[in-house]
Each structure stands twice: as structure tokens, then as C-alpha cells.
Amino acid sequence: MSVLPDRQVINQIISGHYADPFSVLGMHQTERGLQVCALLPDAQEVWLIDTKTGRRVAQLDCEDPRGFFAVQLTRRKNPFRYQFAVTWQESTQIIEDPYRFGTLLQDIDTWLLAEGTHLRPYERLGAHLMSLDEVPGVSFAVWAPNAQRVSVVGEFNFWDGRRHPMRLRRENGIWELFLPGVQAGQLYKFEIIDCHGQVRLKADPYAFKAQMRPETASLISPLPDVVENTPARQKANDLRSPISIYEVHLGSWRRHTDNNFWLSYGELADQLVEYVKYMGFTHVELLPINEHPFDGSWGYQPLGLYAPTRRFGTPQDFKDFVAKFHEAGINVILDWVPGHFPSDEHGLSTFDGTALYEYADPREGYHQDWNTLIYNYGRNEVRNYLAGNAFYWMERFGIDALRIDAVASMIYRDYSRAEGQWVPNYYGGRENLEAIAFLRYTNHTIGVERPGGVTMAEESTDFPGVTLPPDAGGLGFNYKWNMGWMHDTLNYMQCDPVHRKYHHNLMTFGMLYAYTENFILPISHDEVVHGKRSVLDRMPGDAWQKFANLRAYYGFMWAHPGKKLLFMGCEFAQGREWNFDTSLDWHLLDDENGWHKGVQRWVRDLNHCYQQYAPLYELDYQPAGFEWLVVDDHENSVFAFLRRDADGNELIVISNFTPVPRYNYRVGVPQSGHYREVLNSDSAFYRGSNMGNQGGIHSHPVSSHNHAHSLLLTLPPLSTIYLTRGG
């Protein structure tokens, strides 16, 4: 008979309540020789095999009918590699013992993970296919410092939490285990006995692949290979480059017409890439594609931050999808949500029985607007989980930029909270200092480790220095959405033209702060939902005027300083609000001479013109790149300005936001010569009235608007025209 561990310990191991399984299971040196213990429920017979010789060394005694086996080897003193020959009810199987392997995390990883500065935590935590001591399998690691016991459960062990309890690394609260023989594609979860003794089944926070709702398990999947960061893609994100973004929700851009089912990543790669290229957009921005349990969140309530959603295919399919865009010369932006997460039981909520990933105080940790939980940015491990995820998408999938959602909700503790419902910071202020530090760290890390990779903030307040570097007191973003400009200009466009003269400043106010941040001008998904109506439907007037207003507005927007963003469907003036559960109304484009086709052509030509003429983008963030020519003609609702590039080349832009044509309208210009009409939103090609300046016009030596020369123009009704000197 062997010398058994304490009976209470055996009972705890069998019941799945023993926190230190490696101290009992496996091979151990004792005063009487080697002792080997194993927990193999349902096994009928277990033999110990010397791996080197392949010979059976000894039979393990069944010390408990619930599956606890042990043997004492009095003649052997030194540990050796071994296996078990296990006889089940109908077969005999040679298996490796997970409890013969040593620790997995290296000291440097332990230090960096605890400090919260591990650049690639996803290389150590989660599930990783590997070979250990020449044995193929999977290493598992999960952070749950307050758990009483953590086990890996899955298809490979009948989802039985007794079979594979993990080792706790007390120095950092990480549980780890190497499971031989486990393969890619198998389902798994972590079974946690939390600090209160309650059993919880949790998906892997670092899983690279996950089941689609309503299922909730993680899937073992290889870590994606690194994607090369090319100079061309880096340059395309530069402040002096043209950036025109097509914002897309993959689940509703287009669907199968026969069953309204989603297109796959592969089908989207074939259709969406070609369309974006044809339309002249330089970038595509994807609403969140992280795995998420609720379709109606549009992806903005993710649980599987490291797993591309299975709705459209596999992680490799998504990676190929991104590569297809890159082959077409289009950069890919991913909407990223580090501000909150849903409270689904299988997710991060009370992960080990405590508020581990979220703030414990609901005044800090509960988001009232979305019924979600807020990450605890004060914890090193949480910051590392999020910052590592940002780098993961860039390094492993080739994502070129991240657009960070709801930044204001992160950096203000009183965001959407009444008096008494929020907790001040250490200094008594309303700023979330931990979130600010997290954003600065993440942005700085991306800037250093992924040159050319950029971040874009959806930040709706006037928080100063969003796009300033952290060492200058800023948050370190590269770009910021200009929500104020969007609201002001849309409010202006909604006015009846006869009343626009009273709101003239709405179109000019944006230039007063245009150089305080690196702005993107966004017409996003948020502007075509929740009863706001479509952008087209906001335009006043009859059908002709609605479409003319929209074309004129887009022309003004594309010429205004700031990079551009347009949500899908807006490029062809979809008439209804966006519905995430069905395709865009592509049938509106069936009429080649229709209104919607005209708007689509206009946006396409705007994009190609935008890329062709450097004055429209090169000096977006420098005062030298813009000059008002006509800023105060509120009576006629006319605006005129010029854009200039670094070489002094200029492009003139004039908008008439009334349905009244303006004849012989004089606009001062810096230089004499012939000015060619590059674009005219009133062209018949775009379904306008075809009024204009016969393709071009010569300047006159008549001073106007503080310039010695001027143009005598015909301004079509509800129009924007572009003019360039020469040609």
C-alpha cells in the first residue's frame, strides 16, 4: 500500500475544492521513494509507464472508488518522465499526466503582468497551443486571484471541474495548467469556485476564438501570426495624407437576399473591398467585430475582446478580409470599446466572486445609460488586458487604426450621473485619473511599438489636449471626432433656407477652434438612428431640394479642414434610418438616372478629387491651409474659402445654401488667371439643374474681399462648386 495524503485532502481533491493540486497529484519525492497520485474518475485500472523505456513500472492502487489512485515506488528515488495506461470501461488509453509538468509563466512575465506593463499579455494568458517536454498540448492561464479553485473544463474532460484543477501562482493571482493532447477547435471554459464558494463557469477573457450567441464557450485557436507594418500603410494615416473613411457595420452593409443572412468575411472581402475602392474612400472603419452576446448592441458591448465574432467566419477569415483591403491600398480602422462591458454571467462580471475587472462601487463601476459595467482602470492587470488588446489587433490582424468609443464616459467620473451618484477622484475632481493614465499609456505604447498606427477619439466634450502627446499634457490620440462641427452644420442644414441667414455662424464657428485638435469630420452611424432620421430626410424642401441640399453639404464638408468620415448608406442618400438587422436599400440605385445614383456619383467624385488635390488635405491642421474669402454673407447664405497646400497651390470652394441662383456673384481671389470648375454639385450628372460657369472663368482685376483680383460667378441653387487656377 502507498502512503496516502491526508483523507481530508483526498476528499477535497475529489470534490474539486482543493486549491493546490500540484502538491498532491503527480510524482513527488518522499522519504520512502517516489509517490505518484492521480485523479481519474471512471477509470478502472491505472498503470505507471516509464516513457523512456515504454515499460510498465507499477500499478496504481485505487484508494477511493471516486477515482483517486496512488502508488509508492520504494526502489526509485529520482523523478522520471512517465505516462499512465488507463483502462476505462471499454478501452485502454495511454495518457500524459498534466501534473508532471513544471510552472509555465517565466519570472519576467510574472513581473510585467503584475506591473501591468506586459506588451503582449495575450502571449501568456489564455489558451496556447504548444509542446512542453516534447508533448503537444495547450497551456491555459487565467487571472483570478480571489478564487478558491480554478479548473479547465471542456470537451476533452466532459466539462468536469474535478479533473483538471489548475496551479495558482500566488505572486500574481494567475492560475495555470498545461493539458497534453488538447487540440485546436475544442471548446473550453474556466470553472471557478469563487471567494464565496460559488461555482462559476467563465469564458476565457483572452480567448482568440469564441462561440456565437447564444452559446458562450471559448474555442482553442492558434495565436495569429504577426502582420507586417508597411511604410505605405503608415503614410496613409499621416496628418498630411488624405483620409476619407467609410464606416461600416458588417452585419447590415449587405445581406443574402434569399434569407436575409449575413455575408461571410470572405464574401465581404469580395464585395466590400471592391466597392470601397470604387467609391474612392481611403479607409474603412468597422463597427466593433469583437465577439458580443447582443446583436442590438451593434458590437459596442463586447465580451470576447480578443476574438473576432463568429457571425461572419473564423479569425483567419477576418485576417484575410483585412489583408484584402490592404492589397487594394485601403487602410482598416477598428472601433474599439475599452470603456465598458456587459454583465453577462459567463463574462468578466464578478469574475472570481469579486469586482475584479470592474469598479466595486456602482457609482464608479455601473454605467446607467447602457446597463453595463465599467473597467477598473486603477488595476494594473485590467489596464494590461485592455492595452494589450489594442496592440493585439494591430500586430496580429494588421489593423491600422483604432477608433476609441465613448471616451468622454471614460475620462469623467460624473458622466451622465446626477449629483451624489458619482465618486470624486483623489483631488476631489470629476476626472477619472486612472482612465486618463490608461489612455495615455495605450496611445504612447502604440506610437512607439507600432509606427504609423493611430488612435481616434470619439470624445464629445471640450476636454483639452485630446490629440496632444502625453508628455505635453495631452491624451495622446492622433485624431479626434469633431462632434461639435457635425451637430452645428447638420442643425444649419435642417433649417429652411429662408431661415438659414439667422444661423449663419453655425457653418463658420468650427473654424474658430479648428486647429485646437486634429479633427475628423464625422457623419457616423449615431446620426441615422434613434429617431434622428436619415441625413437625407433631415434636409428641408421637396425631393429636388433635399437631394440638392445634401450634395451641397457633402461638398462643403469634403472641402472643410479635417479628415472625413461617412457612414454606409449615406453615400447614396438612403431615405430611412439605419437598421442593423437588414441590408442597406441597394435597390435605390437601380435607376441609373435616379436621385440616389446622383448622390453616389457625387460622393465618389468628391473622394477622387479629394485625393487628387493636395490643398484639400495636406495642411488640414495648419492655419496656412485655409482662408475665408466670403464669411459674412448671411443674407445670401453664401460661403467661400480657399484651401492651400504646402507648395502654395490653391483650390477655391463656394457654397450657396439657398435655392436662389446667384448671378454675377463676385468673389475675391489671391491670384489672377483662368479658374477651372473642378466639381459642381448642381451638374446634371448628379441630377442637378446643370447651372454653372461653363467649365471655367477668367479673373478680373477688380479688388474684392481684400484681394486685388476677383471672379464674377454664377452660383447654382443649393450647390457647392470647386475651382482651381490653371488648366
Swiss-Prot record:
A single GO molecular function term of this UniProt record: cation binding
UniProt GO BP: glycogen biosynthetic process
CDD domains xref list: AmyAc_Glg_BE, E_set_GBE_prok_N
Alphabetically ordered keywords of this record: Carbohydrate metabolism, Glycogen biosynthesis, Glycogen metabolism, Glycosyltransferase, Transferase
Pfam families: Alpha-amylase, Alpha-amylase_C, CBM_48, GlgB_N
Subunit structure: Monomer.
Identification of the protein by name: 1,4-alpha-glucan branching enzyme GlgB
